[in-house]
Amino acid sequence: MKAAKKHKKQKLWSFSLLCLLMAVGAPAGVAQEASIDRVVKQRMSANKIPGVSLAVLREGKIVLLKSYGLANVEHQVSVKPETVFQSGSIGKQFTAAAVMTLAQENKLSLDDKIAKYFPDVPATWKDITIWHLLTHTSGLGDYPSEIDLRRDYTEAEYFAAFTKTPTNFAAGSSWDYSNIGYATLGILIGKVTGKFYGDFLQERIFQPLGMTTARVISEADIVPNRAAGYRLVKGELKNQEWVSPATNSTADGSLYLSILDLAKWDAALYTDRPLTQSSRDKIWSPAKLSDGTTKDYGFGWHLAQHHGHRLVFHGGAWQGFKSFIIRFLDTRLTIIFLANSWETREFKFARELVASFYPEFALPAVNTIADAEPKTTALARRALIQLMTDKIDEQLFTPDCRAELGASS
């Protein structure tokens, strides 16, 4: 009897495993693809996004690869899977991965203080460790206002400006998203390896994984399939603003990537190359503060538990580009998109895409309320616009209001 039950369980287990294996890498369903098409086209129309590149993967295998719109509006070049976009801050996960490869080789420790590599840092930096920089718990903030993004600083000049910036809190005591923290990590990688951090990424991550178009940004170089970035100015589409080559070479998110490059990256995160299981566990663990509380951020990844799912994600925004990657660690589903418009609402866009697979993530519908007094509403709207433009029709306001506004009655 026990043997028969055991045999039955084995058959059930084998059948379940077969179903799982068939599901992994299976194409997205017709309804899901139609839903994604609808979401992308609605978002592109609403936010005037020229082009989008999108991939859906299960366990590192592409199940849906889509291209929408234009990579370059002026030349009417369509987006394709090989189109290269700017990364924005999703580039931080590659900086973190580079640091972790060095930690795996015992070339540095996450507990090392920055002063070990930069002895002349100010006293406020003395307690900052590599771990603090990775988790945004260093107390460092964003780029100081004195930095001119159009000026071509040397790496030493950048770092000198960083160290003059006051810290916001003691290292490890709180959390504050810090671009200069990740830019500092890039400089540190150079100190440890003797190589520019972008060259180290090429050698240790991009080339081994076959990410053939991934690289540090260079607007001067000839880059095949490069998309143009755009912004809206008073509703009109404009080219991205120019920044200096030095500004586009920092480790806080200055990469070129295609959707195919990111698909290969996602696949690699299911293997021990380049990151071991121990390293992957660390990059997706919440940062623990000195008071014992935690923040939902690992090393270059936001963390969340949502609707029973464990997920990691990050967005990016830079020079007329937006990007997003979200990975469900439990169901092994990944959704990635790259867009060439600053107006892309990347977090809302991502949630709408996720809802194609998990309806519980859908944003709640907004219930409209019937206006019982539309004429009064129209008058109020007109008065508000006048207040905003300083062109006031006195007859819309009571004598007391006119007195407050300084208008003569």
At which residue positions do the language-model features occur?
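Short, gly/Ser/Thr-rich active-site loops of penicillin-recognizing serine hydrolases
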Residues: 339-406
